[in-house]
Amino acid sequence: MVATQQGPDRPGIDDPGRGRRIAIDVGSVRIGVASSDPDGILATPVETVPRSKERGPDAPDIRRIIAIVSEYEAVEVIVGLPQTLRGEQGKAAGIATAFAKRLQRAVEPIPVRLSDERLTTVTAARNLRESGVKARGQRPMIDQAAAVEILQGWLDERSRAVKPGESSKDAALEGDL
């Protein structure tokens, strides 16, 4: 889980099974939010949450994410972990990890995972531009699209790690046979 992790988590490890997942792209000004369908196949944008200057457990951004997790009945939350192309972590990764730790305390027992999000914002911006979205006022949409990229990558990797209808515990038992 987040508290002891140095790097990103791997999908399928301690998998909670069927249910919606929420992904967040933590920025210094905004937080992009995406959700999956209950079967964990498709990621879709939810909203962009303004980032609060407060850093406590009752900060408005944390409260809004908690409400979204509750509203969507999420079984897992994935937080994008920005790393360099060499896999190193800088200031942005520290901010995302700190946010993930605060969120974990607020939504327990729902697991909060870190996922490598290299180039998701670049990919999201390019995809929006190619679909004809104008640059002006695009930042909130880019944040949501980046969260979709983070979540879709997690879901795709999870589908390779966990067969439909089985949890990671089932897969581990199967490997012991």
UniProtKB/Swiss-Prot annotation:
Entries under InterPro entries matching the protein: RNaseH-like_sf, YqgF, YqgF/RNaseH-like_dom, YqgF/RNaseH-like_dom_sf
One GO MF term: nuclease activity
Disulfide bridge positions per record: none
EC number: 3.1.-.-
Keyword Cell division assigned: no
Biological processes annotated in GO: rRNA 5'-end processing
GO cellular component: cytosol
Key words, A-Z: Cytoplasm, Hydrolase, Nuclease, Ribosome biogenesis
Subcellular localization: Cytoplasm
Enzyme class: hydrolase
Region described as Disordered: spans on this chain: 1-20
Family according to the record: Belongs to the YqgF nuclease family.
Function: Could be a nuclease involved in processing of the 5'-end of pre-16S rRNA.
Protein name per its UniProtKB record: Putative pre-16S rRNA nuclease
Species, as recorded: Rhodococcus erythropolis (strain PR4 / NBRC 100887)
